[in-house]
């Protein structure tokens, strides 16, 4: 089983751990890095969908050398999901579990193992790519990420957003399973996903799996934040957790 999660916009360079490996798709990342270097201010503003001030600040990231990474991927992202995953306080068994099972989907790096060394960057899957030979990052990556994830596993637990899981969905073949995890809350008689709470729950679920060395059969036992497994809403490719608001 593999577990996929989205990256986070917020990143840091001091995670307290050293990288153990290079990203599988480092060559492709360097191609994208070179493309970003080739753009002028206006081009970067389009790619990053940012104003001049934010673009100038983000542009400083491009001075980094991808072959001299600063921090492992698992500790480079500091968004809400990663805060609740809290990998920095997992024991070695938990970290080993994540190293084996967890992958971070990335616009720049494609797919990252937890201890792949990376640098801070700004590049989302839906970023426009002016003056590039590919129309989109989806076209650039094609089947590469799918093939890497499914070469040894037929089951992937999907905790990523649709923006990132679309790196996989168009290429699924018979026998492949992409098991989506959904967190819902009841409000005004309707069940909806509350984005902030879902990010927290995704991070906590990854941690819960790692702490117990758990697999798919254990998923119904997750009850953090008051969520409970909803068997009537779940199915072959969907696991739903619900709670009363």
Curated annotation (Swiss-Prot):
Disulfide bonds: none annotated. This is UPF0246 protein Ldb2075. GO terms for biological process: response to hydroperoxide. Belongs to the UPF0246 family. NCBIfam families: PRK02101.1-4. It comes from the Bacteria. GO terms for cellular component: cytosol. It comes from Lactobacillus delbrueckii subsp. bulgaricus (strain ATCC 11842 / DSM 20081 / BCRC 10696 / JCM 1002 / NBRC 13953 / NCIMB 11778 / NCTC 12712 / WDCM 00102 / Lb 14).
